[in-house]
């Protein structure tokens, strides 16, 4: 079977119009008001200063604190953590955070009441736009790296899928947002979870095709030399 473009499969692996990756080791993105790679500047609440820290021990300590609050993290702070993990060389770990953030962002977008999310300046509208921006802008970097080792990627996505089977209380994670009735949450989440099943099947069955497409698009040459280091023991997924 002929594989569809990787961008279609994962929803975020293709470059956005006007986006170029000049340095594959550094994610250069700006998603207002949550993250600006120049600085970096971070505004996602409680963990902002630690995520922006120049000190690696301070950053790692922040990741440890976030892991302890894993079930209640919102998608902007999870995306920013993925970006910073990637930039600081914890790239395998960044894959897990990225796919977790993507899942949470898509769940948010699926279950927000769009009739009540408002317009520019309203928190619901801004978050809805942010999940799309994070996914599109960050995906080419982390997927560019992650798709270079499908055998490593598959169990990470399986973990994210397993953790996503239970819908969190979104009203506590996003207290100012109006969502669809809770009676609709499970069905919305099931559709999202099934999407990962389809992605996993494709990844397992089409490794050779994916590899060839990466070579043809220059992704293999651009990302294959990147390395990854481990977080201190006990902090991985």
Where does each model-flagged region fall?
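N-terminal alpha-helical interaction modules that lie
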Residues: 20-72, 104, 118-237
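N-terminal signal peptide c-region/cleavage motif recognized by signal peptidases
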Residues: 13-18
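Hydrophobic/aromatic side-chain positions at a characteristic register within alpha-helices
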Residues: 70, 86-87
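Alpha-helix C-terminal capping/termination sites
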Residues: 52, 87-88
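Sec-dependent signal peptide recognition
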Residues: 2-9
